[in-house]
Amino acid sequence: MTTILDNFQRAEKIGEGTYGIVYKARSNSTGQDVALKKIRLEGETEGVPSTAIREISLLKNLKHPNVVQLFDVVISGNNLYMIFEYLNMDLKKLMDKKKDVFTPQLIKSYMHQILDAVGFCHTNRILHRDLKPQNLLVDTAGKIKLADFGLARAFNVPMRAYTHEVVTLWYRAPEILLGTKFYSTGVDIWSLGCIFSEMIMRRSLFPGDSEIDQLYRIFRTLSTPDETNWPGVTQLPDFKTKFPRWEGTNMPQPITEHEAHELIMSMLCYDPNLRISAKDALQHAYFRNVQHVDHVALPVDPNAGSASRLTRLV
């Protein structure tokens, strides 16, 4: 019996998501490239991982030009396949391989698109919770899209208690690092502030190697928070009165001299209740003259077009 998977040939492994392996594949009928996320089903008792169910249910109803599109979901044998649109690479690889491509115009275009997508998610009561360069996909036409919704979740008002083991360390908001279980859209905005800074500086803003090191890197730059600049911070579970008292330093020079300095600081505001929203960020003066870049010279994919590398998918 043939299945939809018989229509695809696998070209190469291109990464690993929150769960499962991601392959580039090609449609036999159209020649279109797609991204296939393969998730192994461990057994009848465990079934489909909750992360996969969450991503499928959220993306099925989340249609936006800057959110990666989920085309189909197929179960074959002991594997579940999610068929996504294919984009050339993620933002992390682009920053690593071709730093000179990040002109002020491209950074502005990318941030405008990302904020538009994140604002759309928030309007639809969805937190991404794992925004980082690896989960932002780019193509040669200047598009950037949110991907990997494996840690995303719908949220309600009033707030519910959520796990704080979310968001990759370098992009994790201080309220999560300090143990709060009540958080909202501000955690995504903090992550975007870090990503924004990284595109400008060509390096991570807060590259911590542990939770305490991450906190201290933030404190050294932005000052140790207290009740004056973040009401309620001393009541958070992991706040310590013995934290070193740093007065803060200026942000790195590429940020302080950048036209987006004010916007970045409003995204990195300590108090999550005062942190700028995605909707308001899009109205900031920084974006007044935004023009979307329609061509980006991405690094050449050495495997692109290599028919000899294609193999049967199943």
From Swiss-Prot:
GO molecular function, one term: cyclin-dependent protein serine/threonine kinase activity
GO biological process: cell division; G1/S transition of mitotic cell cycle; G2/M transition of mitotic cell cycle; positive regulation of receptor signaling pathway via JAK-STAT; regulation of G2/M transition of mitotic cell cycle; regulation of gene expression; signal transduction
Binding site for ATP: I14, G15, E16, G17, T18, Y19, G20, I21, V22, K37
Catalytic activity: L-seryl-[protein] + ATP = O-phospho-L-seryl-[protein] + ADP + H(+); L-threonyl-[protein] + ATP = O-phospho-L-threonyl-[protein] + ADP + H(+); [DNA-directed RNA polymerase] + ATP = phospho-[DNA-directed RNA polymerase] + ADP + H(+)
SUPFAM superfamilies for the chain: Protein kinase-like (PK-like)
Residues found modified as Phosphothreonine: T18, T163
Endoplasmic reticulum recorded as keyword: no
UniProt function note: Like Cdk1, could play a key role in the control of the eukaryotic cell cycle.
Subunit composition and interactions: Interacts with cyclin CycG.
PANTHER family registered for this protein in UniProt: CELL DIVISION PROTEIN KINASE, CYCLIN-DEPENDENT KINASE 2
Protein name, per record: Cyclin-dependent kinase 2
Source organism of the structure: Drosophila melanogaster (Fruit fly)
Higher taxonomy: Eukaryota, Metazoa, Ecdysozoa, Arthropoda, Hexapoda
